[in-house]
Amino acid sequence: MARVKSGKITHARHKKVLDAAKGYYGNRSRNFRTATQAVDKANQYATRDRKTRKRNFRALWIQRINAAVRAVDAEMTYSRFIAALAKAGIEVDRKVLADLAVHEPEAFAAVVAQAKAAA
């Protein structure tokens, strides 16, 4: 019986890792062992940062809403605005509110006025 070698399989596995490491600096894109480590670390960062991205966007939306609310009404703060929205029964999430504040300031001002009337 012929000896089974895994040349094609090993080559394909190495090629997959080295293709993933394309563009990395120095040996990280050329040497299989260091490329494997670099790709593994990159995947760890990617997994972690998918979770972090959600937090960052929520913080950004809150900052934008706060700035827009204060621009419309100097007395109103973000927390008072959110409480007033809940009291008014307006169920709009922060992403939509931030988008309104940036792209349609008149509509956002109307929402602020409606929330203030309910508060």
Swiss-Prot record:
Lineage: Bacteria, Pseudomonadati, Pseudomonadota, Alphaproteobacteria, Rhodobacterales
GO cellular component, one term: ribosome
Family: Belongs to the bacterial ribosomal protein bL20 family.
Function: Binds directly to 23S ribosomal RNA and is necessary for the in vitro assembly process of the 50S ribosomal subunit. It is not involved in the protein synthesizing functions of that subunit.
Protein name, per record: Large ribosomal subunit protein bL20
Species for this entry: Paracoccus denitrificans (strain Pd 1222)
Entry-linked SUPFAM superfamilies: Ribosomal protein L20
Keywords carried by this UniProt record: Ribonucleoprotein, Ribosomal protein, RNA-binding, rRNA-binding
GO MF annotation: an example: structural constituent of ribosome
Listed InterPro entries: Ribosomal_bL20, RIBOSOMAL_L20_CS, Ribosomal_protein_bL20_C
A single GO BP: translation
